[in-house]
Amino acid sequence: MRKALILAFLMSALFARVDLELIYSLFTDKNFDKNVYFKGEMRDRLKNNFYSSDKFDEIKVAKLGQSSEFSGIFHVWLASKNGTSLDLYIFAKEDGIYALRSLAQTGIIEATINGYEVASEVEKARLRAMGVDIENLRLILASDNALLKFGRENEAKFEELFVLYQKDEVAANEVVKRLHLSHAAYDDGLFELIIGGITDNVVGFMRVENESNLPQMSPSEFIMLERLSPNSKWYLFKTT
């Protein structure tokens, strides 16, 4: 009986560590024990090196929420002084870390932006004439912090678009383009302003009237959801 109680205590202490501190240590502790904490699909990444303190100057971890499957869903922000940043999303249960996601298939977007930045003015004009919206591409790759700021600054316009879309979808999507977004649409009854992405790897803003209608985050669809502000009906989202 005593051994069982001791084991239960040790296991509860282990589970309790799957929190902000544990997620932070994955990226800052060279001796992080992946064999203990990596579960599910993360077992395939035991040989991966997650230590990032030598590559990034700032590492922040915040809890985005939880779901019926995961007790903790975390946002990890890695940033360097040269402006490079990376947003990661970690899915954990009480006994360990089960999945890690980020916005995928961004290589072609990065290449287009890099090519545009070194192009001549004539070439840039040609690309714009072909329909390339470089500001839209930059928004797709923007950090979550920058996207949340963009969303807050334009929330009133988002609401106007929501109203306009009910009356005239074509007119609404013309306004959407002026905001450097891709398009407006309804998906499963929720109004979305899509910034863009490749195939199913999309970033955008979602309007949710009732929190009960908010989709659950998961490694297989909505990899992140974050409200613009405490009383906002708008959420930043990313999918995979």
Where are these regions (language model features)?
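Alpha-helical protein-protein interaction scaffolds
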Residues: 18-22, 69-85, 94-95, 121-123
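Surface-exposed, charged secondary-structure patches
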Residues: 48-88
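C-terminal luminal/periplasmic domains and tails of membrane-associated envelope-modifying transferases
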Residues: 40-41, 51, 112-130, 134, ...
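A cross-kingdom marker for long, charged
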Residues: 193-240
